[in-house]
Amino acid sequence: MKQPYNHGVLFYHEHSGLKDIHNGIGEVAKSLSSMCKHLSLQLSENKGDIIKYCKSIKNENYSSDVDVLFILGGDGTLNELVNGVMQYQLNLPIGVIPGGTFNDFTKTLQLHPNFKTASEQLLTSHAESYDVLKVNDLYVLNFVGLGLIVQNAENVQDGSKDIFGKFSYIRSTVKTLLNPVKFDFSLTVDGETKEGNTSMMLIANGPNIGGGQIPLTDLSPQDGRANTFVFNDQTLNILNDILKKRDSMNWNEITQGIDHISGKHITLSTNPSMKVDIDGEINLETPIEIQVLPKAIQLLTATEQNN
């Protein structure tokens, strides 16, 4: 088999979510070495390291022949690589291997949730261009959330998602829903302004959020548009019932309680100022400005999901 790439770099964290990271790296490397003449394994020890490595690749200090990047981790780790690639304008395809607590975007790429199977799928994958959301000075691949989404993330203690799995996350979500924090908002999408009061807002680029799929056939991370969802009180009551049953988010039951607005340019201010979750990382506060960057990044996409 001819290797399509010269030099690939696989980024990973020691605390990526895999029980045995070194054994996992070995399994992944078997597949990736079939794709690349040269494969470098690059440990990211601290937050921000991946962005620094992207700068080094851009300046050719890392190597002059890197032509593909791989990331082993969850949505937060992928977000760091996306920011490095966008910030330093690296026109390189990215192969994503699930290895964290949440791997929503790998579903969009039709990749299997098992890291070994997903790395094997990359052998027959192809590069496709996907939209990126620019949120103030940061870049987002999957979603922007505020209100209950941030509340819930802060209620889950560090590491508990790995130790107790889905149950701990759902228990925290129910606790959050019983004590929602409401806020006033002013939302402008492509020049049209909406004002109101809510306790949860979501701006989605990808169709998979929080382990569930948003049931909109026209929602695509390749259409040049972002989708804003404003949740009302009725929706939150249904969400609470669903989560108490420990089921996945059932969008079909709650869509009647959601305002949906699609557009290319979004500004959002709130009172009071609210923390903002971007792909699982709480890095911003309102006000925010969001611009859709059409087909700004290349991601390796499987032909079909391997179940």
Curated annotation (Swiss-Prot):
Where does the DAGKc domain start and stop, copy by copy?
3-139
- Which residues hold Mg(2+)? S220, D223, R225
Keywords per UniProt: ATP-binding, Kinase, Lipid biosynthesis, Lipid metabolism, Magnesium, Metal-binding, Nucleotide-binding, Phospholipid biosynthesis, Phospholipid metabolism, Transferase
BP terms from Gene Ontology: phospholipid biosynthetic process
- List the molecular function annotations (GO) for this entry: ATP binding; ATP-dependent diacylglycerol kinase activity; metal ion binding
Cofactor(s), names only, from the UniProt record: Mg(2+)
Q: Which PROSITE patterns match?
A: DAGK
Q: How is the cofactor bound?
A: Binds 1 Mg(2+) ion per subunit. This ion appears to have a structural role and is required for catalytic activity.
Give the EC number: 2.7.1.-
Top enzyme class of this protein? transferase
Positions contributing to ATP binding = S44, G74, D75, G76, T77, L78, N79, E80, T101
* Entry annotated with the keyword Lipid metabolism: yes
GO cellular component, as recorded = plasma membrane
Protein's UniProt keywords contain Transcription regulation: no
InterPro entries the record matches? ATP-NAD_kinase_N, Diacylglycerol/lipid_kinase, Diacylglycerol_kinase_cat_dom, Lipid_Phosphate_FormReg, NAD/diacylglycerol_kinase_sf, YegS/DAGK_C
Q: Where, by residue number, is the active site?
A: E281 (proton acceptor)
User: Which SUPFAM superfamilies would you find in this protein's record?
Assistant: NAD kinase/diacylglycerol kinase-like
- NCBIfam families per the UniProt record, alphabetical: YegS/Rv2252/BmrU family lipid kinase (TIGR00147)
Name the job this protein performs: May catalyze the ATP-dependent phosphorylation of lipids other than diacylglycerol (DAG).
State the similarity comment: Belongs to the diacylglycerol/lipid kinase family.
Protein's name in the database: Putative lipid kinase SE_0507
Write the lineage as a comma-separated list. Bacteria, Bacillati, Bacillota, Bacilli, Bacillales
